């Protein structure tokens, strides 16, 4: 979005042509008007904000109005064009925001070096030294000669690129003024050198922020935008990122965000949507806005790769994007993107309902074989959506979340993958889930929200790990465990919500929760129909004396939880392990989970524990 100057390199500060060997003088550095750079940044910021407002108008007013009043091919064509226009505005918002931050960051670095320079010049003036145009410093006679006692002659000191490599000035020039002059000359040289380096670094970035011709914003355009964003992130580290409170508590992060100016927030959202969108404690609406923008950058980034993992994640990201853009049907809660990323097996956190405004908030942790793929984008998100819709029929102020914030174990290679038999991923995921729930508690508008942690399959082990921090999971009142292979503790009260607030669903034909109770002869037969998962269950049972893979069976009487009624599920199939949330396949289980989430767990129909 910036121009080129006949292919020649141009200084971002002076606007003059140059190259790698161009020199910036200290006089030119002193005269740089950083206020003009900041004014230009403000102009790009206003353009970015206008584009964002236009995009919001299209998505929140024009598209819903069109869908609600118009039908037919013409309406569909108009909808497509409006969506395209909204994408254009989103691209303008992103690129203009990057320009704003680039110019502000450049001004920040130049002003820093101007202060270094000015302090050196002021010191030279106070000592009556002369700073020449080339940065050398002339100093007067001083000190006393050892032989005649007369003042030692003055001289001139020139700044060196790396003062630490130069011999101490006292060894070559005993005049006490020589050392002071050398120090001043070095600081002048360092300031000029650092400013020149910043000048050319930002000039390269500004040249790259150039829109392609035409009105369409293609995937390739977003790929280019992702590259632009990465370049600006690297350049602006000292200006912005170092201040992001990654090591602070969620409550402190919330306070940090509240204390920023509007301009600062806009810059963080534009340059670091990946950081802000995944920072626990930041308000949900802010995270959603940041992650929707980062989603487009991730799609562009992965589009440029040609490998199977990238294609799998790309398909999932596009499906999530499609759902975010789709019209919310009557009775459905709005969708919020609270986290997105391509690290590990992929990350995605999706809420149905605003978790900050909701009185009841539930977060569901999926388990074995879950990754950022189409199964997650369709199946796991549907579980959260179904739970939210059913719970909102009981209490409309409810939100339900699908949380893929960790690397769940994968059974890609059959028995060669033993991750599921260990606890490392659960412990790592439990730490992340604990932080996420802390963030929800910090950003929720209610004094005492009702919060529920739901773990399915290996996800229940992850939830169990999250409860083992001091005080348990922050603000969580109820815990739901379904299809659980164990949670790492042997008693419900060890989950720190009270045993009457721990609910367990275990289908009769769920291989994960029942294979361990079978005899070894039956294990051999029963494991085969289930492929790698069945083999692993058999191996886990034979390999130890635990009631289940990860401790005592949560569905057992000894564990002490409240076991609710679930459908037994089809035999000799993994479907029994997957239908706990499905209102069509297991109405009783889905309804029970919804009641617990809505704060009415006391109404859940129980069945006897094993």
Please provide the spans of the model-predicted regions.
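Lipolytic serine-hydrolase domain surface
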Residues: 341, 353-357, 367-449, 469-610
């Amino acid at each position: 979005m910036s121009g080129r100057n006949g292919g020649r390199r141009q200084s971002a500060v002076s606007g003059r042509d140059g190259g790698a060997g161009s020199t910036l003088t200290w006089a030119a550095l002193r005269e740089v008007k950083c206020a003009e750079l900041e004014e230009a940044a403000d102009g790009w910021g206003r353009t970015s904000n206008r584009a964002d407002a236009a995009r919001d108008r299209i998505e929140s007013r024009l598209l819903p109005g069109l869908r609600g009043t118009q039908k037919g091919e013409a309406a569909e064509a108009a909808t497509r064009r409006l969506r395209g226009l909204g994408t254009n505005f989103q691209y303008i918002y992103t690129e203009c925001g990057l320009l704003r931050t680039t110019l502000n960051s450049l001004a920040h670095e130049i002003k820093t070096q101007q202060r270094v320079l000015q302090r050196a010049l002021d010191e030279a003036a106070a000592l009556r030294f002369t700073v020449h145009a080339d940065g050398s410093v002339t100093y007067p006679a001083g000190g006393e000669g050892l032989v005649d006692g007369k003042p030692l002659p003055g001289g001139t000191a020139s700044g060196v690129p790396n003062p630490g490599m130069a011999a101490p000035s006292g060894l070559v020039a005993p005049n006490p003024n020589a050392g002071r002059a050398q120090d001043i000359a070095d600081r002048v040289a360092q300031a000029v050198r650092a400013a020149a380096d910043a000048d050319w670094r930002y000039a390269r970035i500004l040249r790259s922020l150039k829109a392609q011709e035409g009105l369409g914003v293609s995937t390739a355009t977003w790929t280019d935008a992702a590259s632009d964003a990465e370049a600006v992130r690297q350049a602006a580290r000292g200006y912005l990122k170092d201040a992001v409170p990654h090591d602070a508590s969620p409550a402190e992060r919330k306070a940090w965000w509240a204390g920023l100016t509007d301009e600062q927030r806009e810059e963080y959202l534009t340059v670091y949507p990946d950081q802000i969108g995944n920072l626990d404690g930041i308000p949900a609406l802010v995270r959603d806005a940041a992650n929707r923008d980062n989603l487009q950058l991730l799609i562009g980034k992965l589009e440029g790769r040609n490998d199977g993992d990238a294609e799998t994640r790309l398909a999932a990201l596009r499906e999530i994007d499609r759902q975010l853009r789709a019209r919310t049907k009557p009775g459905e809660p709005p969708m919020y993107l609270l986290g997105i990323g391509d690290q590990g097996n992929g990350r995605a956190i999706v809420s149905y309902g605003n978790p900050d405004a909701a009185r009841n908030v539930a977060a569901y942790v999926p388990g074995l074989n879950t990754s950022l793929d189409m199964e997650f984008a369709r199946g796991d998100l549907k579980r959260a959506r179904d739970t939210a819709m059913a719970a909102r029929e009981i209490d409309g102020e409810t939100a339900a979340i699908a949380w893929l914030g960790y690397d769940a174990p994968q059974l890609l290679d059959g028995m060669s993958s033993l991750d599921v038999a260990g606890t490392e991923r659960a412990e790592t995921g439990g730490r992340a889930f604990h932080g996420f729930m802390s963030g929800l508690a910090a950003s929720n508008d209610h004094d005492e929200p009702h919060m529920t942690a739901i773990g399915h399959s290996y996800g229940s082990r992850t939830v169990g790990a999250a409860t083992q921090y001091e005080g348990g999971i922050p603000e969580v009142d109820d815990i739901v465990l379904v299809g659980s292979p164990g949670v790492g503790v042997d008693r419900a009260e060890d989950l720190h919500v009270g045993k009457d607030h721990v609910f367990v669903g275990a289908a009769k034909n769920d291989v994960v929760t029942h294979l361990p109770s079978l005899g070894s002869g039956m294990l051999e037969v029963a494991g085969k129909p289930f492929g790698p998962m069945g083999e692993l269950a058999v191996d886990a049972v034979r390999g130890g004396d635990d009631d289940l893979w990860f401790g005592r069976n949560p569905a057992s009487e000894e564990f002490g939880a409240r076991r609710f009624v679930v459908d037994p599920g089809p035999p000799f199939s993994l479907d029994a392990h997957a239908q706990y949330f499905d209102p069509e396949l297991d109405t009783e289980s889905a309804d029970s989970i919804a009641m617990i989430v809505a704060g009415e767990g006391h109404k859940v129909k129980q069945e006897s524990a094993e």
